[in-house]
Design a protein with these regions (language model features):
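Transmembrane helix exit motif
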Residues: 22-40, 101, 105, 131-136, ...
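Interfacial segments of multi-pass membrane proteins
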Residues: 52-55, 68-91
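Selective hydrophobic functional segments
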Residues: 3, 99-136
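Lipid-exposed faces of alpha-helical membrane segments in multi-pass integral membrane proteins
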Residues: 19-27, 54, 94-101, 121-129, ...
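Hydrophobic alpha-helical transmembrane segments in multi-pass integral membrane proteins
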Residues: 3, 57-65, 157-165
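Single conserved hydrophobic/aromatic residue that forms the stacking wall/gate
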Residues: 1-11
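Small-residue-enriched transmembrane helix starts and helix-helix packing motifs
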Residues: 21, 41-57
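Interfacial loop-to-transmembrane junctions
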Residues: 130-155
Length: 165
């Protein structure tokens, strides 16, 4: 523990962020091409869930997307694009829920008055728009795949390298 204090700064280097952005973009492309699309959503095994959870540890590397690494792992386990993406969205729910409720709790400890109706309206609108966007995203990736996201990640990584030098 003590030896690791401050070590996170070693991996927050712009080169590492740029290269991991490119690397995981290319890995997404490979996984998308390699996926056999054979494993149904209902037959998720403990072993598959464990590997997908373990893969999320790679998201600690700056430039690695937690959602992307979840999708990559699920694709390599032969899940479809849609199922892999649903895994990524479902695994975000606990994190987003914790953030939401911790913000609500912290609002309760502020000295200013809170308009709870506004909080409810904003939360409802956020949920509905997210639900709509997820539906659009799932339809989109089923039709065109992940190639646009791969191109985006590779170009972003190259741009970051360009900025670094």
């Amino acid at each position: 523990g003590v030896r690791l204090v401050g070590s996170e700064m070693c991996i927050r280097d712009r080169d590492i962020i740029a290269l991991s952005t490119i690397f995981f973009g290319i890995l997404l492309w490979i996984a998308d091409r390699a996926s056999k699309d054979q494993t149904p959503y209902e037959s998720v095994t403990f072993k598959h869930a464990f590997f997908i959870g373990l893969a999320q540890c790679l998201a600690l590397i700056p430039g690695t997307s937690r959602s992307a690494i979840t999708i990559i792992c699920a694709l390599f386990l032969s899940y479809s694009r849609t199922v892999a993406s649903k895994f990524a969205f479902m695994l975000a729910i606990p994190t987003l829920g914790i953030i939401f409720f911790s913000e609500i709790i912290s609002l309760g400890f502020t000295s200013s008055e809170i308009n709870w109706l506004d909080v409810l309206l904003v939360s409802t609108f956020s949920f509905l728009s997210s639900y709509l966007c997820i539906g659009i995203f799932l339809n989109l990736i089923e039709r065109i795949g992940f190639t646009p996201f791969v191109v985006y990640r590779v170009l972003l990584g190259i741009f970051l390298l360009f900025l670094a030098y």
